[in-house]
C-alpha cells in the first residue's frame, strides 16, 4: 500500500490541476461501430451497432457481418464502380473540396463536409459527439439514459429530465454503472429539479454478481418526473452508465420469478409471483422446502416470511436446529419512510435496539430516535420529544445503566462537527445535555466510544480516534469520567497507532481490551488511504498493541464480538488511486478475527437474493445474533440483516467443538463433557488454546519493515525487534555496532522522531513543542534534539527551565541571567500549562516530597496598582489569578504559590523561596499555522494560495483535501473547487444562458426583447423557485417554493430549463432565422455578440456595455475582457500604459510623452523583440547624452526589418518630455540601416552641457532585431595627453618601487637585529667555568710553583662536537712582552687560541674535570648535528 499512499498525492495534483484542455480529452475506446469508410460511401452506410449491446458482443457481431458480406460485395462492386465514375465525371471538383470526418459521428451528430468535424446536437460534445455535456429532456414512456460510448469525459456535468404524467410511478433500472467511487456521482431526484426529494446518489462500480444473489439496483420515482444529474471531476474516468426507465414496469421485472400484470384494483402493474416466492418484486423466498412439513414447521401463506418453525427449528425453511449447528442469514424489510439512514449508531438494552441519529436525504419525516423490538421484530412508537435534538450523523453511542451517551458527530444542518455530550434516558425517553467541568477534548466525527469499568472502580467512556476539522485525524484516546463529569486526553503507551475516520471497534470483556479495525486515515497531509490495521487497546494499562492486519481495506464498516471472535461486515472498500481495479464502494464482505489465535478468516457473504452491499450501517449483538440495520449503497437502506451464528452447545463431541467456526471460538470442558463458548472458558483453557495457536501461527515478517519507530516495532504480534533506526524480524540479527531491542519497555521514551510524523495537521503538530510543521511538504517533523540545551524545555518559541534552589528574587534573576535568560513571563496558555504540569511532576517525585515549590516568576510591581511581566507585558489576571486577598501591599515580586489552582501571590523580594522559572528565546522560529480549512467561510479564502483546502459549492463548506471523503461520504458535495477557482455564490451570478444551464439548480428567464438577454434564477422545469431566506435551524429545513411570478409568460418572458433560446445575442442584436445575430450593435462582435470590438473592452454578455480602451495614446488595442492595454511602445507598461519599465533602464513620462531607453556612449546595444509578449510592439525610443563636449557624436542603427527613423535633439532630457521643444535632425522611412555624425560645434556641446539626442524607431513589424550605438572618439592622437599619461604612469610605478624597496630594507634590518640578538642570547647561555692560570715570571722563584703545573700545559677548554669525533681545543697563549715582562701599553699579554682537533682516537676521559667542577657546571642542552658548543 505504499504505492497506493504515494499515488494519492498524484491524484490530488491531478484534481487541483484540472484545466479546460483536460476536460476536453476523450475517454477510452468506444463501441459505436460504423463500417462506412472514405472512398466507399455505398457499402454498409449507416450500419451501426446499438449502445444497448454489451461491449464484448459488438466486435463479434461486426465480425459476423463481415464474414457474411462477400456475396453482397460482389453484387455491389459494379454498381459502386459506375456510381463512383459518374460522380467523378459530374462533380469531381466538388468531391475534391469535401472533407469527411476521420471518425464517425455518434449520438445524432453529423459530419460537416467543409471542416471535416462533427456537428453535435444539443447535449453532446466531443470529437465524435461521444460525451454528454448538457441537458436532455426525455418524454417517452420508456427509454434509456447514458453518458455516451466509451469512458465519460473529465470534469463534466450532464442532466436528464424524464417527464411523465403527474404522480405516475417511474422505475429506473441501472443495467450498468461504473464511476469513480466517492468522487463522481449520479444524483436522482423524484421531481423536476434538484430541489425535489433526493432518492439516490450513485457512485462506484455497480455490476450484477455472477452468483445471482444480488439484484440490479432500481430506483422508484412517484412524482411523474425524475431528474438525473451527473458530475465527474478531473482525476480519472470509467465506462459510465446505462440506465433504462419505464412508467409501466414491475419492480425488478419481478426478479424473473413471476409475471408482470395489470392490477385488478388500479391501472398500475404488479407482479404475480411464482410458487415459493413472495414480495413486491418476487424476491423473498416463501416456504422453502415446504418448511420441512410436518417435522420442522408449517407454511403460512398469509405471512410474508412464510415458514412458522416449530420450537426446535429455525432459519430458512426451518432447516437449522435449535441450538444452531451452523450459521445463517435472514433479512427483514420495512417500507417506513422514516427508517432509511446511514452513519447512525445503535445499542441494545434488553430486547430493544435503540437507533439514534444518522444521515438522511430528506428531513421532512426524520426521527432522531428509533426503537426496534428484537423479539417481535417490530418498530415501536416513541414520543415526539425524542426528536428535540439536532440531527447529526457520524457520532458515537455508549450504553450504561439505562442511559445512552451520545458524543460528537456532524450537525447535518450546518456541516459543523460538535463536541456535545448528550444523555438519552430510556425510561422517560428524554435528552439531557451534559456540561463537563473540564473540556480537554476534541470535536470529532467518525469515531467510536465504549463505557468500561476500570480495575480501580472508575467508570469512564473511552472515545477512540475520529476526524476533527481543526486538528485533522485524531490518534488520541479521549476519556470521559462519568462520576467526575470531566474530560481528559490519555497519554497512552505501547505502539504509536494512526487514528482515522470510520473504523470499527469492539470491547471484549474477557481480555478487557478494545479491538479497533480499519478506517480512513491520512498518513501525511497529502497522502491518505483506507487501512486494514487491527489494534488492541488495554483499557487498564492504556497500552496499544498492533495485531495482524486483515489485508482487506475498508472504512464505515461494523464489528461485533461473538464468543471470542470479532465479526466484521460490509464497508467501503474502494482503494483505487489512478485507475479502477474493481474495488467497490459498497461491500458485503464478511470476516472473522480469532482473538485467541490472532488470525483472520473470510466468511461466506449473505445469500439473500438481494443487494446487501453497504457501508455506514450499524451492527449490534443480542443473544449471539448480529443485527445489521440500514446503511448506504447509493440508496439509503432500512432493512435489517440478521446473522445467527452457530452455537457451541450444539456440538456434542470434542472434535466437533474444537472444529467449530470460523466465526465462533468454542472450548471443550472435559469436566462436564460440554462444548462451551470462549466467554465461559477458564484461564487454564485459555492459555492452552493460545499455546496451541502459538505453535501453529505463521509470522508475517514482511510487516516488520513497515514500523518506523521502536514502540510499534516491539509492541506487535509479528515478532519484530528494533535495531537502532529500523525494524527487522526476530530471526534477523542487527548489524555490528547496533543495539537490539525486543521489549517495548527498553525503547527510548519520548522520542519526537517517532511520533511527530503521526500528526496530520498543522494545529495538531503545533500542540507538541518538540514538533514543527513543514508547510511545503505538508508534514510534521521533529525539531533537532536539545534545541534548548540540557535541562531546558522547548515551549512554543521559548525555552523554559524550572530550578529548585532556595533564593531570593534578585539571586534567582541573576541565575537566569547567567544562562542568558530572564525570569519567565507566563503570558501564553502553553507556558502556563507546561509549568503547572512540570511542578506537579517534580512535587510528586520522592526527592522533592518534603519540599514545597513556590517558584519565582518574572512578575513585578511597577507602581501602586500596576504589575507587569519581565517582557514588559501587563498582567491580565486571566491565565493565572491572584489568590484571595492578593496582591498584598507587602510584596513587590510574584511567586506561583498554588500551582494546582493557578494561584499567584505577592512576596517580599528579599525573602528566599524554593524554586524559580527561567525563560529564554529558542533558536528557532515556530511557523504559524494557516487558518484551518473548516474556519474559512468563503470560497476565495478557502482556495487562495494553496491546494490544502477544497470548496464545496452547494454545501458552502471548506474542507481539508485529505478529508474530502470523510466530510462527504454520501455524495453530499455536488461540485468542488480548488486553487483560486470559485463559482458565483448563486444563480444570479451567471450572465449567459449557457453558463446558467451548466448549473443543475438554475434556469434562464429571457426578457421580452428576444435578443438573448435575461437573468439566471434558481428554478425547476416548471419555473423559477424562491429560495428560503431562513437557514436550517435544528430539525427545521425550509424548502424552496415554485414562484412563477419571477418569470411571467404573460409579460412575454420565457423560461428555459433544458435548452437555451435559439437567439443568443446578449441583447445587442435581433436574430434572423431565429438563431443568427443579424448585426451586433453597441460596439460588440462575435457569433453571439459576446465580445467587444477591437479598441474597446468590457463584458457585453447579457446586455453589458463596452467602453474604449484607456491607453494614454500608447496602444489602440486592449484585452476585450479586462481592458488591459497592449502597449505598442517598448518600455511602456501598465494596464493603461501609464508607467515606464524603470527596472530595465527606461525612463520618461508616458502620461505626457513616452518612455526612452538610456544608451551609454561607446557601447553597442542589441534589442531582440521576438517573444510572444513583444507581439504588439511597433516602436521603441532611445535617448543619448554626449560625454565629451569637445568631440563629435557618431551613431549607427540597423535592424532585421524595415523601420521608420526620427532623430531630434533638445537642450535637456526633462525638456524632451514636453511636446514642441524637440528640434528635428533626421527623418527617414522604410530603411534598414542608418549612420550619422553630430558635430560638437554645430550643436554647440559646450554651451549645452545637457544636450540630449532622441531616437524614435517606429512602424516595424514583429519579430525584429535592432542594433544601435553612440560613440565619441578623436581622429588623431593627442601627443601631449599621451606623454602626460605615460610619464604619470612611469613616475607612479617608480615611486611605488622605491616605497617597496624601502619597506624591504626596513624588514631586512629588523630581521638582522633580531637574529643578532638571538645569537647574543645563545652565546650568553653557553656553559662556563673558572680555571686557575699560573703565569711564570723570571723574578718568581721556582719553588713557589705548584707541582701540578710542572707537567705539559693543558687546554683551558675542550668543546666536543656532535658524535665526539672532533672538538674545539682552547688554550692560553702568552703574547710577547716588553721589558720587565709587562705587555706594551694598550695590548694584552694573554690571548685565547682555539683549534679544531680530532679526538676520535683518544679516550673519552683524556680530559677530565674535577668532581666538584662537574657538579657546579650548568646543564647544557644537547647540541645539534655539527654544532660546537
Swiss-Prot record:
Tissue specificity as recorded in UniProt: Isoform 2 is detected in plasma (at protein level). Expressed and secreted by activated T-lymphocytes. Expressed at low to moderate levels in peripheral blood leukocytes, spleen, lymph node, tonsil, bone marrow and fetal liver. At very low levels found in thymus. Isoform 2 is the major isoform in peripheral blood leukocytes.
Q: Which domain of life is it from?
A: Eukaryota
Q: How is it modified after translation?
A: Heavily glycosylated.
Q: Where is the signal peptide?
A: 1-28
GO cellular component, alphabetical, reads: extracellular exosome; extracellular space; Golgi apparatus; plasma membrane
UniProt keywords, alphabetically: Cell membrane, Disulfide bond, EGF-like domain, Glycoprotein, Inflammatory response, Kelch repeat, Laminin EGF-like domain, Lectin, Membrane, Receptor, Repeat, Secreted, Signal, Transmembrane, Transmembrane helix
Which positions, given as ranges, span the membrane? 1280-1300
List residues of the EGF-like domain.
101-129
Q: Where is the CUB domain?
A: 132-248
Q: Which residues form the propeptide?
A: 29-83
The entry annotates sugar attachment on 213, 237, 242, 253, 264, 300, 325, 362, 383, 416, 428, 575, 623, 731, 863, 914, 923, 986, 1043, 1054, 1073, 1082, 1198, 1206, 1250, 1259
Please list the GO terms describing molecular function. carbohydrate binding; signaling receptor activity
Keyword Secreted annotated: yes
- InterPro entries reported in the protein's UniProt record: Attractin-like_CTLD (IPR034011), Beta-prop_ATRN-MKLN-like (IPR056737), C-type_lectin-like (IPR001304), C-type_lectin-like/link_sf (IPR016186), CTDL_fold (IPR016187), CUB_dom (IPR000859), EGF-like_dom (IPR000742), Gal_Oxase/kelch_b-propeller (IPR011043)
Annotated PSI domain residues: 703-748, 755-794, 932-983, 986-1061
Function as written in the Swiss-Prot or TrEMBL entry: Involved in the initial immune cell clustering during inflammatory response and may regulate chemotactic activity of chemokines. May play a role in melanocortin signaling pathways that regulate energy homeostasis and hair color. Low-affinity receptor for agouti. Has a critical role in normal myelination in the central nervous system.
For this protein, the record's PANTHER family field holds: ATTRACTIN, LEUCINE-ZIPPER-LIKE TRANSCRIPTIONAL REGULATOR 1
Complexes and interactors: Monomer and homotrimer.
Question: What's this protein's name?
Answer: Attractin
Gene that this polypeptide is encoded by: ATRN
Amino acid at each position: 500500500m505504499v504505492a497506493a499512499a504515494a499515488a494519492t498525492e498524484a491524484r490530488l495534483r491531478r484534481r487541483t490541476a484540472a484545466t479546460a484542455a483536460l476536460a476536453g480529452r476523450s475517454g477510452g475506446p468506444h463501441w459505436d461501430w460504423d463500417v462506412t469508410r472514405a472512398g466507399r460511401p455505398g457499402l454498409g452506410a449507416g450500419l451501426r451497432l446499438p449502445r444497448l449491446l454489451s461491449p464484448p458482443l459488438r466486435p463479434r457481431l461486426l465480425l459476423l457481418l463481415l464474414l457474411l458480406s462477400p456475396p453482397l460485395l460482389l453484387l455491389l462492386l459494379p454498381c459502386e464502380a459506375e456510381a463512383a465514375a459518374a460522380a467523378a465525371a459530374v462533380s469531381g471538383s466538388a468531391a475534391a473540396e469535401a472533407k469527411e470526418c476521420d471518425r464517425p459521428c455518434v449520438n445524432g451528430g453529423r459530419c460537416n463536409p467543409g471542416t471535416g468535424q462533427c456537428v453535435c446536437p444539443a447535449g453532446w460534445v466531443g470529437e465524435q459527439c461521444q460525451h454528454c455535456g448538457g441537458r436532455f429532456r426525455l418524454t417517452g414512456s420508456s427509454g434509456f439514459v447514458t453518458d455516451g460510448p466509451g469512458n465519460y469525459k473529465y470534469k463534466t456535468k450532464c442532466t436528464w429530465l424524464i417527464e411523465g404524467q403527474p404522480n405516475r410511478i417511474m422505475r429506473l433500472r441501472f443495467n450498468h454503472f461504473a464511476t469513480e467511487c466517492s468522487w463522481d456521482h449520479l444524483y436522482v431526484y423524484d421531481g423536476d429539479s434538484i430541489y425535489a426529494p433526493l432518492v439516490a446518489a450513485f457512485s462506484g462500480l455497480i455490476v450484477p454478481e455472477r452468483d445471482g444473489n444480488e439484484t440490479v439496483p432500481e430506483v422508484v420515482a412517484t412524482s411523474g418526473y425524475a431528474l438525473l444529474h451527473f458530475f465527474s471531476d478531473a482525476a480519472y474516468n470509467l465506462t459510465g452508465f446505462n440506465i433504462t426507465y419505464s412508467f409501466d414496469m414491475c419492480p425488478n421485472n419481478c426478479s424473473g420469478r413471476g409475471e408482470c400484470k395489470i392490477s385488478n384494483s388500479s391501472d398500475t402493474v404488479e407482479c404475480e409471483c411464482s410458487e415459493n416466492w413472495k414480495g413486491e418484486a418476487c424476491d423473498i423466498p416463501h416456504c422453502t422446502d415446504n418448511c420441512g412439513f410436518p417435522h420442522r414447521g408449517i407454511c403460512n401463506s398469509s405471512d410474508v416470511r412464510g415458514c412458522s418453525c416449530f420450537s426446535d427449528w429455525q432459519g430458512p425453511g426451518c432447516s437449522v436446529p435449535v441450538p444452531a449447528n451452523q450459521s445463517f442469514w435472514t433479512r427483514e424489510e420495512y417500507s417506513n419512510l422514516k427508517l432509511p439512514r446511514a452513519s447512525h449508531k445503535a445499542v441494545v438494552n434488553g430486547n430493544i435496539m435503540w437507533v439514534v441519529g444518522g444521515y438522511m436525504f430528506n428531513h421532512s419525516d426524520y426521527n432522531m430516535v428509533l426503537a426496534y423490538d428484537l423479539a417481535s421484530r417490530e418498530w415501536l412508537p416513541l414520543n415526539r420529544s425524542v426528536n428535540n435534538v439536532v440531527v447529526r450523523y457520524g457520532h458515537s453511542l455508549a450504553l450504561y445503566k439505562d442511559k445512552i451517551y451520545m458524543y460528537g458527530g456532524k450537525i447535518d444542518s450546518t456541516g459543523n462537527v460538535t463536541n456535545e455530550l448528550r444523555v438519552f434516558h430510556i425510561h422517560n425517553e428524554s435528552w439531557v445535555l451534559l456540561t463537563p467541568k473540564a473540556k480537554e477534548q476534541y470535536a470529532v466525527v467518525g469515531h467510536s466510544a465504549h463505557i468500561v469499568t476500570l480495575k480501580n472502580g472508575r467508570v469512564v467512556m473511552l472515545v477512540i480516534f475520529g476526524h476533527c476539522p481543526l486538528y485533522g485525524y485524531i490518534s488520541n484516546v479521549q476519556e470521559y469520567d462519568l462520576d467526575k463529569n470531566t474530560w481528559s486526553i490519555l497519554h497512552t503507551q505501547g505502539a504509536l497507532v494512526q487514528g482515522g475516520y470510520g473504523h470499527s471497534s469492539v470491547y471484549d470483556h474477557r481480555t478487557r481490551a478494545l479491538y479497533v479495525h480499519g478506517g480512513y486515515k491520512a498518513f501525511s497531509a497529502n497522502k491518505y488511504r483506507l487501512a486494514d490495521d487491527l489494534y488492541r487497546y488495554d483499557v487498564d494499562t492504556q497500552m496499544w498493541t498492533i495485531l495482524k492486519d486483515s489485508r482487506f481495506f475498508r472504512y464505515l464498516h461494523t464489528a461485533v464480538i461473538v464468543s471470542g471472535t470479532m465479526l466484521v461486515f460490509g464497508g467501503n472498500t474502494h482503494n483505487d488511486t489512478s485507475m479502477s481495479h474493481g474495488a467497490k464502494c459498497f461491500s458485503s464482505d464478511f470476516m472473522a478475527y480469532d482473538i485467541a489465535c490472532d488470525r483472520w478468516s473470510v466468511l461466506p457473504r449473505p445469500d439473500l437474493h438481494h443487494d446487501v452491499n453497504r457501508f455506514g450501517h450499524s451492527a449490534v449483538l443480542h443473544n449471539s445474533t448480529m443485527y445489521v440495520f440500514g446503511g448506504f449503497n447509493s440508496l439509503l437502506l432500512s432493512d435489517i440483516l440478521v446473522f445467527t451464528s452457530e452455537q457451541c452447545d450444539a456440538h456434542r463431541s470434542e472434535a466437533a467443538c474444537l472444529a467449530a467456526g470460523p466465526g465462533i471460538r468454542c472450548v471443550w470442558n472435559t469436566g462436564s463433557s460440554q462444548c462451551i463458548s470462549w466467554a465461559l472458558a477458564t484461564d487454564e483453557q485459555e492459555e492452552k488454546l493460545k499455546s496451541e495457536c502459538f505453535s501453529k501461527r505463521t509470522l508475517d515478517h514482511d510487516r516488520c519493515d513497515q514500523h518506523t519507530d521502536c514502540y510499534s516495532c516491539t509492541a506487535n504480534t509479528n515478532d519484530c525487534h528494533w535495531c537502532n533506526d529500523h525494524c527487522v524480524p526476530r530471526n534477523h540479527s542487527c548489524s555490528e555496532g547496533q543495539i537490539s531491542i525486543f521489549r517495548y519497555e527498553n525503547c527510548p521514551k519520548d522520542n519526537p522522531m517517532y511520533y511527530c510524523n503521526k500528526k496530520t495537521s498543522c494545529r495538531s503538530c503545533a500542540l507538541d513543542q518538540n514538533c514543527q510543521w513543514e508547510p511545503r511538504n505538508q508534514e510534521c517533523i521533529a525539531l533537532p534534539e536539545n534545541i534548548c540545551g540540557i535541562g531546558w524545555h522547548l515551549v512554543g518559541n521559548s525555552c523554559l527551565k524550572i530550578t529548585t534552589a532556595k533564593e531570593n528574587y534578585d539571586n534567582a534573576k541573576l541565575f537566569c541571567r547567567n544562562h542568558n535568560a530572564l525570569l519567565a513571563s507566563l503570558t501564553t496558555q502553553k507556558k502556563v500549562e507546561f509549568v503547572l504540569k512540570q511542578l506537579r511532576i517534580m512535587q510528586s517525585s520522592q526527592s522533592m516530597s518534603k519540599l514545597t515549590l513556590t517558584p519565582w516568576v518574572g512578575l513585578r510591581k511597577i507602581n501602586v496598582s500596576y504589575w507587569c511581566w519581565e517582557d514588559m507585558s501587563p498582567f491580565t489576571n486571566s491565565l493565572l489569578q491572584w489568590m484571595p486577598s492578593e496582591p498584598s501591599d507587602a510584596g513587590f515580586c510574584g511567586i506561583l504559590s498554588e500551582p494546582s489552582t493557578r494561584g499567584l501571590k505577592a512576596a517580599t523580594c528579599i525573602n528566599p523561596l524554593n524554586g524559580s522559572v527561567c525563560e529564554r528565546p529558542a533558536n528557532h522560529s515556530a511557523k504559524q499555522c494557516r487558518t484551518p480549512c473548516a474556519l474559512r467561510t468563503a470560497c476565495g479564502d478557502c482556495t487562495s494560495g494553496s491546494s490544502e483546502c477544497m470548496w464545496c459549492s452547494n454545501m458552502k463548506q471548506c474542507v481539508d483535501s485529505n478529508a474530502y471523503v470523510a466530510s462527504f461520504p454520501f455524495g453530499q458535495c455536488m461540485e468542488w473547487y480548488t486553487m483560486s477557482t470559485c463559482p458565483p455564490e448563486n444563480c444570479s451570478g451567471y450572465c449567459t444562458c449557457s453558463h446558467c444551464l451548466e448549473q443543475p439548480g438554475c434556469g434562464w428567464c429571457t426578457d421580452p426583447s428576444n435578443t438573448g438577454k435575461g437573468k439566471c434564477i434558481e428554478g425547476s422545469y416548471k419555473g423559477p423557485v424562491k429560495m428560503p431566506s431562513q437557514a436550517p435551524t435544528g430539525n427545521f429545513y425550509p424548502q424552496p417554493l415554485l414562484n412563477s411570478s419571477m418569470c411571467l409568460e404573460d409579460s412575454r418572458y420565457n423560461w428555459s430549463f433544458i435548452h437555451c433560446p435559439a437567439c443568443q445575442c446578449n441583447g445587442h442584436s435581433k436574430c434572423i432565422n431565429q438563431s443568427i445575430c443579424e448585426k451586433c450593435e453597441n460596439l460588440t462582435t462575435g457569433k453571439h455578440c459576446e465580445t467587444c470590438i477591437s479598441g474597446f473592452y468590457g463584458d457585453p454578455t447579457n446586455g453589458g456595455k463596452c467602453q474604449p480602451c484607456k491607453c494614454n495614446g500608447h496602444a489602440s488595442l486592449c484585452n476585450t475582457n479586462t481592458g488591459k492595454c497592449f502597449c505598442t511602445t517598448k518600455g511602456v507598461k501598465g494596464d493603461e500604459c501609464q508607467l515606464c519599465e524603470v527596472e530595465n533602464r527606461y525612463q520618461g513620462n508616458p502620461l505626457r510623452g513616452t518612455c526612452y531607453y538610456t544608451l551609454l556612449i561607446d557601447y553597442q546595444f542589441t534589442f531582440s523583440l521576438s517573444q510572444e509578449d513583444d507581439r504588439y510592439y511597433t516602436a521603441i525610443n532611445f535617448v543619448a547624452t554626449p560625454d565629451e563636449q569637445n568631440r563629435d557624436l557618431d551613431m549607427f542603427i540597423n535592424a532585421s526589418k524595415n523601420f521608420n527613423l526620427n532623430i531630434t535633439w533638445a537642450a535637456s532630457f526633462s525638456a524632451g518630455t514636453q511636446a514642441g521643444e524637440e528640434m528635428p535632425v533626421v527623418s527617414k522611412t522604410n530603411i534598414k540601416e542608418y549612420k550619422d555624425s553630430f558635430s560638437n560645434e554645430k550643436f554647440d556641446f559646450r554651451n549645452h552641457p545637457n544636450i540630449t539626442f532622441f531616437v524614435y524607431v517606429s512602424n516595424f513589424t514583429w519579430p525584429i532585431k535592432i542594433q544601435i550605438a553612440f560613440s565619441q572618439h578623436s581622429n588623431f592622437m593627442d601627443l601631449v595627453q599621451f606623454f602626460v599619461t605615460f610619464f604619470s604612469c612611469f613616475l607612479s610605478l617608480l615611486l611605488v618601487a622605491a616605497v617597496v624597496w624601502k619597506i624591504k630594507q626596513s624588514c631586512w634590518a629588523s630581521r638582522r637585529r633580531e637574529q643578532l640578538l638571538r645569537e647574543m642570547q645563545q652565546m650568553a647561555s653557553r656553559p662556563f667555568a673558572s680555571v686557575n692560570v699560573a703565569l711564570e715570571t723570571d723574578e718568581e722563584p721556582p719553588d713557589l710553583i705548584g707541582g701540578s703545573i710542572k707537567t705539559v700545559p693543558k687546554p683551558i677548554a675542550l668543546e666536543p662536537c656532535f658524535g665526539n669525533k672532533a672538538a674545539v681545543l682552547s688554550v692560553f697563549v702568552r703574547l710577547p712582552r716588553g721589558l720587565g715582562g709587562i705587555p706594551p701599553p694598550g695590548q694584552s699579554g694573554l690571548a685565547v687560541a682555539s683549534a679544531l682537533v680530532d679526538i676520535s682516537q683518544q679516550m673519552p676521559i683524556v680530559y677530565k674535570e674535577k668532581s666538584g667542577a662537574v657538579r657546579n657546571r650548568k646543564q647544557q642542552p644537547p647540541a645539534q648535528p655539527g654544532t660546537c658548543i
